[in-house]
Amino acid sequence: MKKGIFLYLSLLALSLSAQDNIQWRGTDRTGIYHETGLLKSWPENGPVLLWHYDGLGEGHSSVAIDSEKIYITGLTEGQGYIYVFDMNGKLLKKKEYGPDWNTNYIGPRGTVTVNEGKIYLISGLGDIYCFDQDNLNAVWKKSLLQEYNASNTEWGICEAPLIIDEKIIATPGGKEHNMVALNKNTGELIWSSPGEGDLSAYCSPLYISDQQVPIIVTMTADHIIGVNASTGEKLWSHENKNRYSVHANTPVYSNRMILCTSGYGRGSTMLRLTNGGKSIEQVWFSAELDNRIGSMVKVGDYAYGSGDSKRYWFCVDWNTGEIKFKEQGLAMGNIISDDAMLYCYTDRGDMALAKATPEKFDVVSKFPVTMGTEQHWAHPVIYKGVLYVRHGNTLMAYKVK
């Protein structure tokens, strides 16, 4: 009996682990990964490079991992491709899906989402795709901008599809059809929300399921909005403007509190859900905490990230907004966390490992990412003791356990 229980728990743990990275920034889009026994420091030249692949084409999307396969996108000569690798870096499949963003900072932006045998993708041109996971054949495709009378953004749509039960959520940014829920199997419209009628703002939405109503939270050009995930009803909004209408960071949620952060002259806003999620109140605001595109992570009672205007790395008390430290030394960048450590990938190409402590920005190791092309913007991913880093044309896998 004990052996049976142990086997069941072991299989369950493996199953949960295999599902950890099927979408943008992990299981629940928090950037928090759930492994143990990871290295607390790295050799001077960085952790062991297990493998790398140099033929992705351009792009800024991260990997998604499901059933021991790695999925990522890239752009070559104006055409977008999905790549599938095994865990040893062997290319299993490569399939063209159509044109993608080729105007500025070219290449796919949004990370794919894997769900129940399908792969979902929103291109920089605003096309939403559903592919069969096994053969990568297209199941359906919709043009979000054409079908919902929306305009593209200056730097291309950047959104990772959000799956909720039978629905796939996207933010075309139209006046009438600001956010939509489509049937994930057919692409047909389930509901449409006018939101505040803003343009889309490069934000991948967050799903909150522990309130009286299920809520989708995202940032559009001038607002933070909360939408009823079942009906599309706009529950609330909060004005949130910055210089270029860029709000690229997925909100962070914990215990009724939502942290939304943006650069370009904005900062961080902490909202609290009230009335079972049907309304909000502002808890605190800080103009100093102005993360541009690197996201933030919550570890314990503190949030960590980097700033835009002054290039600080900072720690803030989640509940009060008190800044615990703001330190320079690394260029600004993106951040994930695992096993009480912070993984900071800067836009100058340094990968740093720091302790998640409010006392100081304690960087214990770092190394330069020398392979790859163009901007260092793709967010890293951790899966089964391996750190996956994408730099333009190159995908790298480092052993961190």
List where the protein language model places each region.
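Bacterial Sec-dependent N-terminal signal peptides
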Residues: M1-D20
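Short coil/turn segments that connect the beta-strands within blades of beta-propeller domains
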Residues: S67-E68, E116-G117, D165-E166, Q212-P214, ...
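Short loop/turn segments that connect beta-strands within beta-propeller blades
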Residues: D86-K90, D132-L136, N183-T186, N228-G232, ...
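Short loop/turn segments immediately following the C-termini of beta-strands
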Residues: G26-R29, L75-E77, G124, G173-G174, ...
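Blade-level signature of beta-propeller repeat domains, shared across WD40, Kelch, NHL, RCC1
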Residues: T373-K401
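Extracytoplasmic beta-rich repeat domains
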Residues: L50-A64, K94-T113, K141-I163, E176, ...
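Loop/turn-rich, solvent-exposed surfaces of beta-rich toroidal or solenoidal domains
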Residues: R266-G267, E288-A356
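Blade/loop signatures of beta-propeller domains
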Residues: Q19-V48, T269
